[in-house]
Amino acid sequence: MGLPWYRVHTVVLNDPGRLLSVHIMHTALVSGWAGSMALYELAVFDPSDPVLDPMWRQGMFVIPFMTRLGITNSWGGWSITGGTITNPGIWSYEGVAGAHIVFSGLCFLAAIWHWVYWDLEIFCDERTGKPSLDLPKIFGIHLFLSGVACFGFGAFHVTGLYGPGIWVSDPYGLTGKVQSVNPAWGAEGFDPFVPGGIASHHIAAGTLGILAGLFHLSVRPPQRLYKGLRMGNIETVLSSSIAAVFFAAFVVAGTMWYGSATTPIELFGPTRYQWDQGYFQQEIYRRVGTGLAENLSLSEAWSKIPDKLAFYDYIGNNPAKGGLFRAGSMDNGDGIAVGWLGHPIFRDKDGHELFVRRMPTFFETFPVVLVDGDGIVRADVPFRRAESKYSVEQVGVTVEFYGGELNGVSYGDPATVKKYARRAQLGEIFELDRATLKSDGVFRSSPRGWFTFGHASFALLFFFGHIWHGARTLFRDVFAGIDPDLDAQVEFGAFQKLGDPTTRRQVV
């Protein structure tokens, strides 16, 4: 046929059998990729330290999605929450991956069958004898079936009625586990951080989909609407489908980047806003304050802070710190976290407690400034030593660690104090192993960042695709030069200007 690459899909324009075939093949490719990617990630994933080397630090992309739907065990004998297991069951990570690959193979065979046997009776309009599809009826069928699936997921899988439930955690990502969730039918169900809203919204949306599907199966569209929206044209289906996909992509890009109950920080890493707002830092200080109120010493209070909470309060886990085009996992950037060194508290020679001003998200370098409790600058690492008034040496700054590996250790040497002040700019201080993976020290983004960037980018492209195909189907007559109200049978070549009966060619 000699079609250019951007026109090749016209081969399935009036061929319902092969249109079905290529969509089944597309499903085979998607499912096959998902299963294969899962097996690859399982081959490289190290489950030994779920606290300091979780899946999102290792750059896992499909494992978090399986986990949030209730998969936690591996045939390798490990659990995502730590420890070993003896009976993971069929629905382990490997089991889900295998199911996707088997399904992909079956879809592959089905696609070949439908490509070969394309001329089926079901696709033939008995009145005209030509291939055609009853698109409004197909829309009703698909709406009904997707409604059933949506309702079933919310009513059975999420609630644990027939299924594992979903991943649920506390606001600070410390106690996450898979559990059943009761639907939230009140105003709290609209809070994006309330897991109960996932169940209730799927039940409600599924019910609406079932009713809407039955409506479209039993009621035919009015003729004017049918013609006005070009409901008989397959390109209308393409345009509206693209609209549904790009809208969904924009929504999930938002829920991923800003955080929600569907994107737990234990599986996808913290959000950039938790660093910007000092979210974990405030919780850490609150816990320390509670410990001091219970007559614990400063050292004991800081020692009770979980490593997991301290690790979230580290700028290297901020997804906005990694460049969009820096390939690799977070571990390939600043290294594999080995242990928390403890919380450094700086004091000047007069005993004032000093706080290092933290680096904002979009800075690569930032001046080292130490302020007191009132926000007044008391010390810094000067840019020009000749003009310095607040240098560590002049102010006599010392540092002492509380909690962590260096608990109780103090340093007065200016070089060491400045080293830890620089590191305190980045949040809590961790020992990082950069040798194992030959990490280059340049921050990487987490799967949260990749997912958001990918879905926002493709949503924008698909938005333009929706406009393009919507315009093509709505203004098809204008582009083709044929008047839609022309009753006469137009014979191509009969007129000098297509569809204009005043320009009929003379028969010689």
Swiss-Prot record:
Pfam annotation, one family: PSII
Record has Membrane as a keyword: yes
Alphabetic keyword roster: Chlorophyll, Chloroplast, Chromophore, Membrane, Photosynthesis, Photosystem II, Plastid, Thylakoid, Transmembrane, Transmembrane helix
Any one cellular-component term (Gene Ontology): chloroplast thylakoid membrane
Subcellular compartments: Plastid, Chloroplast thylakoid membrane
Primary residence: plastid
Record bears the keyword Thylakoid: yes
UniProt family annotation: Belongs to the PsbB/PsbC family. PsbB subfamily.
Membrane association type: Multi-pass membrane protein
Highest rank taxon of the organism: Eukaryota
HAMAP family in the cross-refs: PSII_PsbB_CP47
Subunit: PSII is composed of 1 copy each of membrane proteins PsbA, PsbB, PsbC, PsbD, PsbE, PsbF, PsbH, PsbI, PsbJ, PsbK, PsbL, PsbM, PsbT, PsbX, PsbY, PsbZ, Psb30/Ycf12, at least 3 peripheral proteins of the oxygen-evolving complex and a large number of cofactors. It forms dimeric complexes.
Ranges annotated as spanning the membrane: 21-36, 101-115, 140-156, 203-218, 237-252, 457-472
Any one biological process term the GO annotation gives: photosynthetic electron transport in photosystem II
Purpose of the protein: One of the components of the core complex of photosystem II (PSII). It binds chlorophyll and helps catalyze the primary light-induced photochemical processes of PSII. PSII is a light-driven water:plastoquinone oxidoreductase, using light energy to abstract electrons from H(2)O, generating O(2) and a proton gradient subsequently used for ATP formation.
An MF annotation (GO) of this entry: chlorophyll binding
Cofactor note: Binds multiple chlorophylls. PSII binds additional chlorophylls, carotenoids and specific lipids.
Protein name per UniProt: Photosystem II CP47 reaction center protein
